[in-house]
Each structure stands twice: as C-alpha cells, then as structure tokens.
Swiss-Prot record:
Keywords: Cytoplasm, Magnesium, Metal-binding, Nucleotidyltransferase, RNA-binding, Transferase
Gene3D superfamilies with a match to the protein in the record: GHMP Kinase, N-terminal domain, K Homology domain, type 1, Nucleic acid-binding proteins
Function: Involved in mRNA degradation. Catalyzes the phosphorolysis of single-stranded polyribonucleotides processively in the 3'- to 5'-direction.
Main location class: cytoplasm
Cofactor(s) named in the record: Mg(2+)
Family the UniProt entry places it in: Belongs to the polyribonucleotide nucleotidyltransferase family.
Subcellular location: Cytoplasm
Protein name, entry field: Polyribonucleotide nucleotidyltransferase
NCBIfam families on file: polynuc_phos, pppGpp_PNP, PRK11824.1
Species in which this protein is naturally found: Streptomyces coelicolor (strain ATCC BAA-471 / A3(2) / M145)
Span of domain KH: 580-639
Enzymatic reactions: RNA(n+1) + phosphate = RNA(n) + a ribonucleoside 5'-diphosphate
Length: 739
C-alpha cells in the first residue's frame, strides 16, 4: 500500500535511570519528500525530518551541495514567539548548532562525487521541556535520508550520554543533567563486523563539574572521556538497528545518480611525472605564506605542462594537484615523522601570550600560536544585560556570552563581513563551553560577561586559540576563574603498510593538516580535567588505544600551553577603572515591594539620587551597579535602610526631613522607610515656646530638623522631640514671664 505507515522502535536501557524509547515512523507525514521520517522520544518529543534531492546535478560545483536546516516551532513548547511579528524568524543558536551536529556525520556518508543538491529539513513539532531535541533530530535526519533512495551509507545513530553519579546515561533530561559531570553527543554507524565507527563527538563539562568533583565525583579526565565513547557504542547500535528495520520496510531503491569524480587516473599520473619533485620540495617550506606562494608557482607550472595534453580539463588538473599534495604530506608524516613546516609530530609552534593588549576595555589578551593570532576582549556589565533567550529550551537567559569573529583578512583574503556564519557560531559555542565550567557563580561574581574572540590571523585551530586568549582576557578583567583553561587541536593520519594500519597523532595541526588528515579533534581543559572536546573523523573506527594515546598527547600539549599563559597572567587582576562596580545586598522577600515602591517610585528615586543601576531578583537578592563604588555603596545604604533597617532606639538623635504636616504635628523621616511624629506641642519649642496655630508656619515639608527619639510604642511608632542648642537659658525665663 503506497501510503502505508511503518514503525520501528529503539529502547535505550539506562539501568537505575530507567528506559528511553525512540520510535521511528514513516508514511504518514510529508509524503512528497524523497524521504521523510518522524522520530519520537518517549512519545513526548517529536521531530519530523524530510530529505529532498534535486533532479539534476550541479556539475559545475567542486563540492557536495548538502544543506541541513533545523526549524524550531514555538508551538512545540506551547509558546508564542516573542518577536514583534509573533512568528519564528532567523534560527536560534541552538538550531544552528543542531544543523552542524547533523551535517558533520551525514556529509561524509554520501557517495563521493555526488553533485545533486540534497536538503534535509528537521522540524521540531513537539517538545517536552525536560528533553533535548538535538540528538533526536540527528536520528530523524539519518532515518529520512536512509529512506530517500540516495547513495548514502547510513544509518547513523546519534546519542547524548552524560556521566551522572558514576554512570553514563543516554538521552538524559535537563533535570538529570543538573547532576552531570560530563555531557557529550556521539554519532556513529555500525560496521559490517558489528563494531561501531565513531564519526562525530561534541562534548563538554558542565557548570557544576568542579563542585561535583570536589564532592567526590569522578573528574572527566582523558581516560574517563574515552570510556564514555565506548559507553555510547551500544546505544548507537540499538538506534541504527531500528533505523535499518524501518528502511527494510519502507526505503526506496537507490536511484541512479551521476558521480563526478574530481579527476581521472591519467591526469594524476601525468601530474605526478611532471611536478612531483618540485611539489615535494615546496612542501618542506616552513612559513605559510612563502609555502603557499611556492605551491601556487608549482601549480601554475603543472597547468602549463599538462594543459596541451588535457585541454578543457583544468578542474581535473586542480583536483589532482590537491590529491598529490595530500598524498605527499601524509607520506612524509608516516615515513619520516616530519610535517609540512618541519616540526615533529608532537611539536607545538612558537607560543606568545600577553594581556592588556588594547586600551580602555575591561580586559584583553593576545594569544599567538605560530601564524594563528587571537585577540580576546572581555566586557563586564550589570546582570540585566545578560542575553535573554526566546527559544524552545527551558534556559531563558545566558550570563556568559562568547562571540567569535573570523574576518576574511585573517587568511589574507577578501570576502563578506557582517553577520556571523554557522562556522563562527559553532566556534564561539565551542570556546564558550570550554570556559563555562570554570566561571564563578552569579553570587560570587554578579556580572554579565561578554567575551569576544577576534581571529586576526589563522593557520590552524582559531577556536582553541580563542579558549587560551579568553582565559587570559577574563583574568585581566578581574574575573575569578576557578582554574585556567587552554585548548589544542590534534590530527590523526593513518596508512596501511604491509597489511597493518599505522596511526600517527599530530599535535597543534596546521590548516592544511586539518584538511589532509583522517581525523581532527580539539581538546580544551584545565590541568586536572577536560572541559570541552570536539572530534570529527573520516575513518571507519579508531582503536581505543590510539584514541587514548592521542588524548594523552593532547594533554601534554595543553599543560605546556598553560605554563606559557600563566607566565603572562596567573591570577585575576584588579578590575579596570572603566568597568562598573557591582555589589549585592540580600533583603527579605516580603520587603521587595517596599524597595520598588508604588509604581516603581522608590527604586527610581534611589537610582536617580545615587546614579546606581539596580536589579532585583525574585529571591530578594539585589544587584547594585555603578560607575563608582561610592555610588553603589550609597544605594546599598538606602536599600538597607528600607528593607534591613537597624531599629532606632530611645535617645538616638537624627537630622531628619519633614515629609508630611498635619494639624497635630509633623512627620519626620529619620531613615528611608522610618518616620517619627514630632507633635505640635513639641514644635512650640522651635517657635520659642509660643503657641503654634499652623504647623507649616514653623516647619514646612522638606525642612531639616534635629530630633531625638523620646518614645517607641508597642507598634514601633516613634515619638520625637526637637534638639535645641542652649535651650536651658533665656528661653526658659521668657516662657515663665509669659505665664
């Protein structure tokens, strides 16, 4: 039956943490797409994925035109969008990061040389607020693509695993993640021998990690992270099996798609004979710009020699040149343990670190690793300046914001500047996740923090350079980090020699090594543990021993980089005089209304009088920010006077202000929110003892008067008497004469 609905199910057993059920469905929704599938998590979260393919290939392209889009629908969480037009607009950061999580394992799974446009659209249609939809979307996208009749070597299973109370838990909820030491998304596919090939990892420690480790939890060291990858494999296997079951029932037969190979063997053979010695020599030049200039010259020489024979095949010559370059680079690494720039496999390029790189800003640092140069700049402000989020996530605000900019001049090119691309958003998010575990709490440091990483020069891992620059910049701004964090990019090259696969891990990879290697992974962390990890591989599985050794190699490099950074700055500096001063005061919750006042009158008055900026939290915590500390202290004193008053005592004297007059006396404000009555009989003393008919003849509103507390009744009402200097002299005699 053409529109028959098919189902498959994957049950994830988390032991003491219960089970999660991922159910796949096809045939009911989006039937005109080449392939469509719905993935449900516990029948409470629903993601629809539709995969479409263009009828004709884009043969003029030299890359595979795959597009992945994630559409967050606010109705999924029972919300109306907060924008002016009340409809969804540009994708959120969560949606963009999920696009990248889907793209990274999907792209290498299509047949090499495919040039038909492929689009995968994942729509979040229902969401339990305690669920995370990103891994559900990975599985839905894989399932819909598997059904579409495309040359695709799936299925791909995606799982989030979190280390909670010593156990790796799959598909954890937001609530469970509150107790997680480490959290990672792992995607992979099942090989013919039954093993799981890990294709992609995105992992991070949490903002609770340090506290949990101090409480006795296991720290996320390299060994623990490697164990987590192994723990994810059985879950991936279950998910792939369910997708394969669905595909067996409903997948279209694989269609005929033209494959455009980058080049034919005859071009590569001719090119090798023409320029291999010159190319080999060019690849030994250490400097990036000099090397690229020589490579361009050799490429021009190759075209000059080959074009007469291969007329009209310029693209093939260019692609073959790249393939030969890749082959020579890899061969040298495997055989000689030497790299493009002459380094050994574990060598790090020259490092440089400095703080206070630019004037006036709240904190800044410059970090250089070879030709990679990153400027980190920190800005501090009131907590009300933290980012407000209108997304499907239950997280509605973000105090630490990390933005990453990659201008075209960083690689010596021209190009568009302006709004960030997906890559920039992804790199910024990776650097942000690396830093979050070591940030002080809101209570310890009540500031909104914006960190900007400017990639001023790029030749290998600007994202990990951003982590290093950010650590130093934050310390320079006076942020009391729990530990410094550094990051390093690693690569892996493998080659089969005499039937045995040899692996070589490379520390601190160049941009070219990233492109020519089999795996690249970025590791950030403190001296004690890993805070963030990103891994992508083109291999069908990496032996656990190789991965463990590569992670240890990365740790050695990270410790060396931390030593260099700590020479530049090892403790938080004094805060910049240009940064706002923020202090906190805690008041009883039932006093919040008094501090705000009717229609905000009191809080507005305090802000106007002191020049401070005041933010009140629901729990009674008040954050007071001002350009100068004295302004913040003045606001704190006023607030304490209202909400945390020191009860006046009999006999205390105050210079008060008349705030109201009546027929029987004047009310005098002694402290904010604390008034007393100066009775008309006492006001006579201020009038020389004469009878007072009208209080305002002696004291008007706003008048200052020195008073003493004469009595406090059972209800806390204050009775005042005036303090008159030298009142025992002539005034008393004059009073007697009048009588």
């Amino acid at each position: 039956m053409e529109n028959e609905t098919h189902y498959a199910e994957a049950v994830i057993d988390n032991g003491a943490f219960g089970t999660r059920t991922i159910r796949f469905e096809t045939g009911r929704l989006a039937r005109q797409a080449a392939g469509s599938a719905v993935a449900y998590l516990d029948d409470d979260t629903m993601v629809l994925s539709a995969t479409s393919a263009s009828k004709n290939p884009k043969d003029q392209l030299d890359f595979f035109p795959l597009t992945v889009d994630v559409e967050e629908r606010m109705y999924a969480a029972g919300k109306i969008p907060g924008s002016f037009f009340r409809r969804e607009g540009r994708p959120s950061e969560d949606a963009i990061l999920t696009c990248r999580l889907i793209d990274r394992p999907l792209r290498p799974s299509f047949k090499k040389g495919l040039r038909n446009e492929i689009q995968v659209v994942a729509t979040i249609m229902a969401l339990n607020p305690d669920h995370l939809y990103d891994v559900v979307a990975i599985n839905a996208a894989s399932a819909s693509t598997q059904l579409a009749g495309l040359p695709f070597s799936g299925p791909i299973g995606g799982v989030r695993v979190a280390l909670i109370r010593g156990q790796w838990v799959a598909f954890p909820t937001h609530t469970e993640l509150e107790d997680a030491v480490f959290d990672m998304v792992v995607a992979g596919r099942v090989l013919e021998d039954g093993d799981v090939a890990i294709m992609m990892v995105e992992a991070e420690a949490t903002d609770k990690t340090i506290k949990l480790v101090e409480g006795g939890a296991e720290a996320p060291t390299e060994e623990v992270v490697a164990a987590g990858l192994d723990a994810a494999k059985p879950f991936i296997k279950v998910l792939c099996r369910a997708q394969a079951d669905l595909a067996a029932k409903a997948a279209k037969p694989t269609g005929e798609f033209p494959i455009f190979l980058d080049f034919q063997d005859d071009v590569l053979e001719a090119l090798t004979g023409a320029v291999k010695p010159e190319l080999t020599q060019a690849l030994t030049i250490a400097g990036k710009q000099e090397r690229e200039a020589e490579l361009d010259r050799v490429k021009g020489l190759a075209a000059e020699k080959l074009l007469p024979e291969f007329e009209g095949r310029e693209k093939e010559i260019s692609a073959a040149y790249r393939a030969l370059t890749k082959s020579l680079v890899r061969e040298r690494v495997i055989k000689e343990k030497k790299r493009i720039d002459g380094r050994g496999v574990t060598d790090i390029r020259t490092l440089a670190a400095e703080v206070e790189a630019i004037p006036r800003v709240h904190g800044s640092a410059l970090f250089e690793r070879g030709e990679t140069q990153i400027l980190g700049v920190t800005t501090l402000n009131m907590l009300r300046m933290e980012q407000q989020l209108d997304t499907l996530s239950p997280v509605t605000r973000k105090r630490y914001m990390h933005n990453y900019n990659f201008p075209p001049y960083s690689v010596g090119e021209t190009g568009r500047v302006g709004s960030p691309k997906r890559r920039e958003i992804g790199h910024g998010a990776l650097a942000e996740r690396a830093i979050v575990p070591v940030l002080p709490t809101r209570e310890e440091f009540p500031y909104a923090i914006r960190q900007v990483s400017e990639a001023l020069g790029s030749n290998g891992s600007t994202s990990m350079g951003s982590v290093c620059a950010s650590t130093m910049s934050l310390l320079n701004a006076g942020v009391p980090l729990k530990a410094p964090v550094a990051g390093i990019a690693m690569g892996l090259i493998s080659q089969e020699i005499n039937g045995e696969t040899h692996y070589v891990a490379l520390t601190d990879i160049l941009g070219a090594e990233d492109a020519f290697g089999d795996m690249d992974f970025k590791v950030a962390g403190t001296k004690e543990f890993v805070t963030a990890l990103q891994l992508d591989t083109k291999l069908d599985g990496i032996p656990a021993s190789v991965l463990a050794a590569a992670l240890k190699q990365a740790r050695d490099a990270r410790l060396h980089i931390l030593d260099v950074m700590m020479e530049a700055i090892d403790t938080p500096d004094e805060m910049s005089p240009n940064a706002p001063r923020i202090i906190t005061v805690k008041i009883p919750v039932d006093k919040i209304g008094e501090v705000i006042g009717p229609k905000g009158k009191m809080i507005n008055q305090i802000q106007e009088d002191t020049g401070a900026d005041i933010t009140i939290e629901d729990d009674g915590t008040i954050y007071i920010g001002a350009a100068q500390g004295s302004q913040a202290e003045a606001a704190r004193a006023t607030i304490n006077g209202i909400a945390n008053p020191t009860m006046p005592e009999v006999g205390e004297r105050y210079l008060g202000t008349v705030v109201k007059t009546t027929t029987f006396g004047a009310f005098v404000s002694l402290l904010p929110g604390k008034d007393g009555l100066l009775h008309i009989s006492q006001i006579r003393k201020l009038a020389g003892g004469k009878r007072v008919e009208n209080v305002e003849d002696v004291l008007g509103v706003g008048a200052k008067v020195q008073v003493e507390i004469a009595e406090i009744d059972s209800r806390g009402k204050l009775s005042l008497i005036p303090v008159i200097e030298g009142e025992a002299g002539d005034d008393d005699k004059k009073d007697d004469a009048d009588k």
